[in-house]
Each structure stands twice: as structure tokens, then as C-alpha cells.
Amino acid sequence: MNFRIVLLVLVASLAGAQAQVIGHDQVRPFPQPKPVTVSDKAAVKFKPQLKIADGCHPYPAVQKDGSITGGLKWSGPQDGECTGSKLGSQIYARSAWVNDVWAIMYAWYFPKGRGAVPLPLITRLFGHRHNWEYVIVWIDNPKSKNSTILGVSMSAAVGYASQTPPEAMYVDGDSVKLEYYYNHLLGSTSLQLTEDTGEFQDLITWDELSKLARYSLNHTDWDETLFDLAGLKMPLKDGVFQELLDKAWPF
């Protein structure tokens, strides 16, 4: 048998054996490493900041040994039991060229997402365990010290919201300012640009993750809603990342 195939089988078996679901507040984030590659340096330079207006604070979704978060049941207050992990938070990133523009996708994980309407039936329809939000920062060249932000696309209540380029009031140096909020009209948590200062989380890029962590993020079913109505997917995972970049193209 081909040695490469054997190695891949062993890695997959090891991941399946070690990966386990743990409490949302027990997941240890990856410390932000010193960036080495051009891609990683650009991801750190343009790392966005996030203000929480409604709902949970971001939490790490996976840790080094592949253990994955169990999230939170979608009942109770929107920020119930999820106002921040004592172990620290996390922001994930993955980058690629799209039509000669460098795209850096950043993603945050939230233990739950739910509607604010108190009626039990409505809550069941719109509340769910796990939530992912992401923003794409489009720049001209990751190698240049004078790289310019050409545009920003973010996951919105419906589809995507974009600005090309973002207005100066929404940018602090090289960092886009975003707000995680609840859209009462559409009944969904999502991202929007804001003038307010937010917080930074330790960044880990897709390539910097351990193999076990990447395996868990790629193979976890994040959507526990009936018929996968929430459409929840880890935005950086293989098979999803490029598709989202193409759909969010703002130019």
C-alpha cells in the first residue's frame, strides 16, 4: 500500500480517536504565533476588531488535540453563559487570491445564536447551538508594506454586506471595526461595520492549526437545526472557503 495513503489513514484514525466534544468554556485557544509567511504576516497586520452589541462573545472552537466545542443550548438570554471564556478567545483566518485580489477571511465562533423574540415557537425556529460569522478583507498585495484595503465583505443577516473601499470611519489604522449585533427585522445575528472600537482576539491561521484541529473543524457538523435550516458551516473549511470567497466578491 502506498505510504502516503497509510499516513493519511493513520492521521484520520488518530483524529477520530482523540477528538472529543468538550464544554464551550473548556476549549483552550491557540496562542497567536509569531507570523513567518507572507500570508500570515498580512493576516496579522489586517486583523479586524470586534465589538459585541448583542449575543455571545467569541470563543475558541477547537484546541490543539482536536477536541471540539459542544456549544450551548439555544435557550435563555442571548448572552447567557457566553460572556467570554476565562481561557481566552480566538479568531481564525485563511487567505487566497481571487481575481488578482488577495482575500483574507477571518472567522469567529459563538457558542449559540438565537432570536430575541420571546415566543417559544419562534425561539425554537430561530435559535440554535453554534454560530459562525466571518469577514473578508480584500487587499491589493500581501507582500507590500504599503498594502491597501480595497474592500470589506461580511456575513450579514441575509447574504453579504460589502463596502469598496470601507469608509475611513470604519477603519482604525489597518484594522476594520466590526460589530456583532442582532437584526430584529430579520431575526438573525450578524456583522456590520461600526465606528466604535472593538476588541482583538488571538489569531491562528488555517495553516498554523494542528492537523488534529483542522481535521475536527473540517468534519464537525455545526448545524443541529431541523433540515439544516440555519445553514451553519465552518467558513474556512475545505470545500466551503473558496465557495464563500467567490459568492462574496464585491467588485
UniProtKB/Swiss-Prot annotation:
InterPro entries: NPP1. Residues 1-19 form the signal peptide. The keyword Transferase does not apply. It comes from the Eukaryota. It is found in: Secreted. Glycans are attached at N146, N218. Its main location: secreted. Belongs to the Necrosis inducing protein (NPP1) family. Secreted effector that contributes strongly to virulence during infection by P.capsici. Key residues/motif important for the effector activities are degenerated in most NLPs, including the nlp24 peptide consisting of the conserved region I (11-aa immunogenic part) and conserved region II (the heptapeptide GHRHDWE motif) that is important for phytotoxic activity. This is NLP effector protein Pc129485. It comes from Phytophthora capsici. The lineage of its organism: Eukaryota, Sar, Stramenopiles, Oomycota, Peronosporales.
